[in-house]
Design a protein with these regions (language model features):
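Short active-site neighborhood of thiol/selenol oxidoreductases, capturing the structured segment around
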Residues: 2-25, 36
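Catalytic cores of nucleotide-enabled group-transfer and carboxylate-activating enzymes in metabolic
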Residues: 4-5, 31, 39, 71, ...
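Structural motif
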Residues: 10-14, 38-42, 380-382
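Thiol-based oxidoreductase modules, predominantly thioredoxin-like and allied folds used
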Residues: 32-57
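Short amphipathic alpha-helix with an adjacent loop that forms part of the alpha/beta core around
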Residues: 59-64
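Non-catalytic, surface beta->alpha helical segment in thiol-disulfide oxidoreductase systems
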Residues: 66-67, 72-110
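Long, low-complexity intrinsically disordered regions
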Residues: 103-131
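Non-transmembrane, aqueous-exposed alpha-helical and coiled segments at domain scale
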Residues: 127-475
Length: 475
């Protein structure tokens, strides 16, 4: 941007320091120095003849003004130097007027520029800047309701969404250092390219804060990993959808919940991060119910399913088990149905509690089916203490659960109409209910209640279904 040569001052009436230096600006002008004064609020307050109305803050934005007054020297249309606030020695050096403002205090701090007031900076960036956003703009007539327009265009999951204005999307993009145009991959079923900008748009609609955006991005990256088999998860007639588990320092930084009501409503980060992923699948990939999404019943968890792990336990965390350090933040995606509660309020030692958990796990998919799906077991704090007080590690609990979940082959009839199971080689011996890596233990939940939660999934069978996928959260 080419600037007027000479001196440029940016001021506002609503600033004691700007009022203080107004006579100084007159003094500069009378000394014959080329001077342009941009006034952010009331152009009539300054006595300088060369004042310019900058109430639209266009010049303040383009000049990058953060503090007023600011005095800038311009040579050949380019800024050479600037000073902020009132520092007599700096103003004198910049103007070449040694006695400038001799009767004023030696220095006085400036005030915040109107161009950086909360909510204003983003509006100016959208209006005058280069945001990097390229998504198609949709004009909404003034007489129409933005929220209703989102419903009518099919952008909603059935609940109201936040209309994704340019300003809101730009503000959301400030939550990451990644470029808006970066392509994360192709979202099934339509295999549409998904950019950071498109993720931000859907994060706005979901109700996310900008600081949640890196978590949403990582969740989208995990969902698009071929190992997760998102297309298959969408097309199945089974109940499942994506479930996001968050580990690392970002949990506390953005205020996630891993305690009471952890799988329920009430926490903005948990609710909106999971919802944002579902909206990306719907709005970018075209994964809509009764189209490609062929779930016979679905689950309320397909609105949103996201929570953080309780890392203040003696066990290794999910993230550590999957190769991350404690100081790294990560997401792990599972396919998941709704939770199945497991109550055991009597067991005070590990073995009977293992039998209770195994009894609940036996019901996953069908009590007479083995190795059909994986499951996540969310161990509540009171159940967790039973294991910890006995010195049991996570690995010991997993081994005991697998041992308790060996099913006799003759019990795998799955509701056959035959009076007795038909003998076959498959009925000999026992079968594991879950593959070796098919059980995952998570720590979370409220302090009161001898409960845990079983969360089954969909066909977690490697190449035949979906596998959990973890991604580091990058800011």
């Amino acid at each position: 941007m080419s600037l007027p040569n000479g001196l440029i001052a940016v001021v506002k009436r609503d600033c004691p320091t700007c009022l203080l230096v107004d006579p100084v600006l007159v003094e500069i002008e009378r000394a014959g120095k080329p001077l342009t004064v941009y006034v952010q609020d009331d152009p009539s307050f300054t006595q300088v003849a060369g004042s310019v109305d900058d109430r639209d803050l266009a010049q303040s934005f383009r000049l990058g003004i953060e503090i007023v007054p600011t005095l800038i020297e311009v040579v050949a249309g380019q800024e050479v130097q600037r000073t902020i606030g009132w520092v007599r020695s700096e103003w004198a050096a910049l103007t070449g007027l040694a006695t400038l403002g001799a009767d004023l205090p030696a220095h006085r701090p400036g005030c915040g520029s109107k161009s950086v007031e909360p909510g204003i900076a983003e509006q100016l960036a959208v209006r005058y800047g280069h945001t990097g956003m390229t998504a198609r703009r949709v004009s909404v007539p003034p007489q129409e309701d933005d929220i209703e327009v989102c419903f009518e265009r099919g952008w909603s999951d059935g609940l109201p969404v936040v209309p994704p204005s340019e300003t809101r999307v730009y503000r959301m993009l400030q939550g990451t250092s990644r470029a808006p145009g970066e392509v994360l991959g192709l979202v099934p079923p339509n295999l549409s390219p998904c950019t950071i900008e498109k993720v931000a748009i859907n994060a706005v609609m979901a109700g996310c804060k900008p600081e949640y955006l890196p978590v949403v991005i990582a969740a989208v990256e995990a969902a698009l990993d071929p190992a997760f088999c998102l297309h298959g998860l969408l097309a199945t007639t089974w109940f499942s959808g994506p479930m996001i588990i968050v580990n690392g320092p970002i949990r506390e930084r953005i205020g996630m919940n891993w305690q009471g009501n952890v799988l329920g409503q009430g926490n903005r980060a948990n609710a909106t991060i999971g919802r944002a992923l579902q909206l990306v699948v719907r709005n970018v990939g075209g994964g809509r119910p009764r189209e490609i999404d062929q779930a016979a019943f679905g689950t309320p968890a397909k609105f949103t399913f996201c929570f953080a792990e309780d890392e203040a336990t003696a066990w290794t965390t999910l993230a550590e088990d999957r190769g991350f350090r404690r100081d790294q933040s990560s997401v792990t995606l599972f396919s998941a149905d709704g939770p199945l509660g497991c109550a055991d309020q009597k067991s005070r030692t590990p073995q009977p509690l293992i039998r209770s958990l195994a009894g609940s796990l036996r019901a996953v998919t069908h009590v007479e089916m083995a190795n059909a799906a994986d499951a996540v077991v969310v161990i509540g704090p009171e159940h967790g203490r039973v294991f910890e007080q006995a010195g049991w590690s996570k690995a010991q609990v997993l081994a005991a659960l697998h041992a308790a979940l060996q099913i006799r082959g003759q019990d795998l009839g799955m509701g056959t109409d035959a009076a007795a199971p038909v003998a076959s080689p498959n009925t000999a011996g026992t079968r594991p209910k879950f593959r070796p890596e098919g059980l995952t233990l998570i720590r979370a939940g409220g302090q009161a209640g001898l409960f845990s939660a079983i969360i089954p999934g969909w066909l977690m069978k490697g190449s035949l279904g979906t596998d959990p996928v973890s991604k580091e959260i990058l800011i």
